[in-house]
Amino acid sequence: MKLLEQIEKWAVETPDQTAFVWRDAKITYKQLKEDSDALAHWISSEYPDDRSPIMVYGHMQPEMIINFLGCVKAGHAYIPVDLSIPADRVQRIAESSGAKLLLSGAEVTVTDLPVRITSEDNLKDIFFTHKGNTPNPEHAVKGDENFYIIYTSGSTGNPKGVQITYNCLVSFTKWTVEDFNLQTGQVFLNQAPFSFDLSVMDIYPSLVTGGTLWAIDKDMIARPKDLFASLEQSDIQVWTSTPSFAEMCLMEASFSESMLPNMKTFLFCGEVLPNEVARKLIERFPKAAIMNTYGPTEATVAVTGIHVTEEVLDQYKSLPVGYCKSDCRLLIMKEDGTIAPDGEKGEIVIVGPSVSVGYLGSPELTEKVFTMIDGERAYKTGDAGYVENGLLFYNGRLDFQIKLHGYRMELEEIEHHLRACSYVEGAVVVPIKKGEKYDYLLAVVVPGEHSFEKEFKLTSAIKKELNERLPNYMIPRKFMYHSSIPMTPNGKVDRKKLLSEVTA
């Protein structure tokens, strides 16, 4: 598959087909090509001998998709940065990535960034001034060059830039379209922010098949009335989201085949799909296929998939995450470094062309988890699991990195920022489960000196500081105050004891 050529052919074959919809804004395939060509031409003229990544800032604006394609046509990887990401984190991404340019689809509220900022109005001028100019196709990202870089949580307090190459993305997109039987011209739900790699599961499968991306933004999700009004208008046929989002939608009785009569495929990734959620979806959408997938950001979104049928639901209380894509393979590694036999738990290791080339500018971190096996790139996921008859079963994290509502995070990073807060002497973050999956984060805090009379006021002050450093989804929901952190006999934090206090 030639990814960019495949997207561009729709500008010729179906130029007036809508490529992307967000509220009242939409772009056609013709506009997508013209504007991304104009932008790529401008980037190449401004940065002729430069291949540094480009930050793309915004939320669900159509310009985001134009900017992504404009970057890669000019030979630059893009770094998606959502509006919800705090200023401090945006600053660290800008500094660590070596980016020289930021393209914005919305007002940039972060100050003193060490990059050139191209505003929304600047972009409109570029689209107009450079209209009709086409970039040199030889300059476009290809092969093992980076296509996008997504920043994920890092245990040192600094986010890690996962480098995904053109070849990685082609392998993923081809597999998604073929294995999940996606058709030409379908409407895809775009629920995940672009800085979350789940969004890649809808963006590129939609664009290469001439589909329409129907974007749902965070304000709609916060107002269910607006959300369901948008869904009713959408005629979505391919649903891509975390299971949690679908579970939230199922609380609305009208969320069913009557609302979305042409629904064909549900693609789930990012967290555990509970058996009962899949069962309800089959009841509400009997003609749709429910697909459960698994994969870390470091292996390009997902590498396994399974069609969840009623037979699968009856057979497995905890659902399998699927069979590996044909160009990759899974190894289950025991602690001694040997490969575990069928049915035995160990660390999931992914081998093949889906695997990232590593973390941008972090060779030491890269060496810890990326390796070569039989001449192919391999990634040690840190996830526990086992394989039985070719089916992968996921058993949570081996360390303290978790998935919460689809977002991956390292508890150590949250603890790092908690301990840096003014009123905190010590802190531990404990993830609290509800059923099979994590429901919220609890912060256990040893407070420093303060003058607050009530604990809730202290909590508000700590949360205010955290809001300046971390995305909202990484901020603990509940706080508990202790005079000291309990320890195990071998000197480690006694997380089990803390957990028992909460669940008692």
From Swiss-Prot:
Keyword Protein biosynthesis tagged: no
The reactions it catalyses are:
holo-[D-alanyl-carrier protein] + D-alanine + ATP = D-alanyl-[D-alanyl-carrier protein] + AMP + diphosphate
Q: What is its main location?
A: cytoplasm
Quote the cellular component terms of the Gene Ontology held in the record.
cytoplasm
Known InterPro entries for this protein? AA_adenyl_dom, AMP-bd_C, AMP-bd_C_sf, AMP-binding_CS, AMP-dep_synth/lig_dom, ANL_N_sf, DltA, DltA-like
Q: Which residues are noted in the entry as ATP-binding?
A: T152, S153, N292, T293, Y294, G295, P296, T297, D383, Y394, N395, G396, R397, K492
Pathway(s) served: Cell wall biogenesis; lipoteichoic acid biosynthesis
State the PANTHER family in the record: ENZYME, PUTATIVE (JCVI)-RELATED, PTHR45398
What this chain does, per the entry, is described as: Catalyzes the first step in the D-alanylation of lipoteichoic acid (LTA), the activation of D-alanine and its transfer onto the D-alanyl carrier protein (Dcp) DltC. In an ATP-dependent two-step reaction, forms a high energy D-alanyl-AMP intermediate, followed by transfer of the D-alanyl residue as a thiol ester to the phosphopantheinyl prosthetic group of the Dcp. D-alanylation of LTA plays an important role in modulating the properties of the cell wall in Gram-positive bacteria, influencing the net charge of the cell wall.
In the record, the note on similarity to other proteins reads: Belongs to the ATP-dependent AMP-binding enzyme family. DltA subfamily.
For this entry, the protein name equals D-alanine--D-alanyl carrier protein ligase
What is the organism of origin for this protein? Bacillus mycoides (strain KBAB4) (Bacillus weihenstephanensis)
